[in-house]
């Protein structure tokens, strides 16, 4: 019975990283790029729960690099699209994007190397940050791109 509850909880948590219709902006390429961001978050979640990997440092660095590179690519695409439609909220979007990239860039790699005992907690914190930021940004800002106020 306990295992059933545990897997149910895992399934509920897993839903947080699933790209569903509620995150769709109606702009196909943006939705596809958002799906990829969710996939990177899901990979991070899977890494957290992979008990066969003791030292996850290399994988953490790889995921951070993937996230940074793909996020920069996505933000560029999204901002170019907003420019092309003369989107009024472009400046606010650029500021939010820059703050997110700044957070990723300023992760202290030396601190990561020294955190053998805290890698699990670091990954949990990272996933929490990613999920919260991405969900709030898509629902609060990106969905407005396809429905600009008149």
Give the location of each predicted region.
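Small-residue-biased structural context
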Residues: 2-150
């Amino acid at each position: 019975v306990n295992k059933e509850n545990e897997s149910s909880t895992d399934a509920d948590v897993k839903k947080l990283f699933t790209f569903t219709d509620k995150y769709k902006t109606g702009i196909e390429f943006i939705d596809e790029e958002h799906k990829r961001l969710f996939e990177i978050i899901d990979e991070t979640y899977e890494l957290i729960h992979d008990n066969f990997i003791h030292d996850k440092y290399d994988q953490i660095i790889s995921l951070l690099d993937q996230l940074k590179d793909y996020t920069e690519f996505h933000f560029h695409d999204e901002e170019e699209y907003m420019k092309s439609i003369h989107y009024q909220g472009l400046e606010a979007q650029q500021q939010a994007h820059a703050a997110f990239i700044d957070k990723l860039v300023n992760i202290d790699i030396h601190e990561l190397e020294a955190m053998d005992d805290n890698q699990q907690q670091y990954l949990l914190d990272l996933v929490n940050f990613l999920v919260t930021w991405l969900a709030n940004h898509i629902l609060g800002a990106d969905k407005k791109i396809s429905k600009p106020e008149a």
